[in-house]
UniProtKB/Swiss-Prot annotation:
Phosphorolytic 3'-5' exoribonuclease that plays an important role in tRNA 3'-end maturation. Removes nucleotide residues following the 3'-CCA terminus of tRNAs; can also add nucleotides to the ends of RNA molecules by using nucleoside diphosphates as substrates, but this may not be physiologically important. Probably plays a role in initiation of 16S rRNA degradation (leading to ribosome degradation) during starvation. This is Ribonuclease PH. It is an enzyme of class 2 (transferase). The keyword tRNA-binding applies. SUPFAM superfamilies: Ribonuclease PH domain 2-like, Ribosomal protein S5 domain 2-like. The lineage of its organism: Bacteria, Pseudomonadati, Pseudomonadota, Gammaproteobacteria, Pasteurellales. Homohexameric ring arranged as a trimer of dimers. It catalyses: tRNA(n+1) + phosphate = tRNA(n) + a ribonucleoside 5'-diphosphate.
Length: 238
């Protein structure tokens, strides 16, 4: 029996609150059950040095966890003087996922940075970050259209992400922390709205998984992501 009696292909309750903070061009609080992430998108009228003169924009991301997002206090990375490898890996994943749905040429020579700050962690923080960041980015792009900076929104669609895994011999979708910490196989899947893959990160924590189990997990991820995309569309329509 899963936590909260969820079916194996059922995601947690998803809540997307737009315009959550005052100043960011796009601001979203996303909740995957008890996992809560604040995603703020900022537009800057410049690009990184390697893109100067290329007539295109850039989308990047930063990721962090508040000290008491977890069961016990985690020291701020700023206090340590450097980012951890996990943090850098996750923020690069978020940025790659977002760029998959943006026409960077249409964005022009400007940069959008999406800051994803985990307020509370109960598994799936990177997948919640990607899903919420997409909505925040969409809102930021719409503001560029509304103020006349851009003629059309340069986003080509929506992107979302979900965790899947094998827990107690069963393939399940959208793992909570308790499930994640006991998973025999743990996988994060990123897809665009039509089901095409952006990234798959999968690891066997114990017993290796079979090719058939991989296909089962990818199918489960597609079912979960379709639920997330529907939640994104519903939020953007409000």
């Amino acid at each position: 029996m899963r936590p909260n009696n969820r079916a194996n292909n059922q995601v947690r309750e998803i809540k997307i609150t737009r315009n959550y903070t005052r100043y960011a061009e796009g601001s979203v609080l996303i909740e995957f059950g008890e996992t809560k992430v604040l995603c703020n998108a900022t537009v800057e009228e410049s690009v990184p040095r390697f893109l100067k003169g290329q007539q295109q924009g850039w989308v990047t991301a930063e990721y962090g966890m508040l000290p008491r997002a977890t069961h016990s206090r985690t020291q701020r990375e700023a206090a340590k003087g450097k980012q951890g490898g996990r943090t850098m890996e996750i923020q690069r994943l978020i940025a790659r996922s977002l760029r998959a749905v943006v026409d960077l040429k249409a964005l022009g020579e400007r940069t959008v940075t999406v800051d994803c700050d985990v307020i509370q962690a109960d598994g799936g923080t990177r997948t919640a970050s990607i899903t919420g960041a997409c909505v925040a980015l969409y809102d930021a792009m719409n503001k560029l259209v509304a103020n006349g900076t851009l003629k059309t929104n340069p986003m080509k669609g929506l992107v979302a992400a979900i965790s899947v895994g094998i827990v107690a011999g069963e393939a399940v979708c959208d793992l909570e922390y308790l499930e994640d910490s006991n998973a025999e196989t743990d996988m994060n899947v990123v897809m665009v709205q039509d089901g095409r893959l952006v990234e798959v990160q999968g690891t066997a924590e114990g017993e290796p998984f079979s090719h058939q189990e991989l296909l089962t997990l990818l199918d489960l991820a597609k079912q979960g992501i379709s639920q997330l995309v529907e939640a994104q569309r519903k939020a953007l329509a409000e």
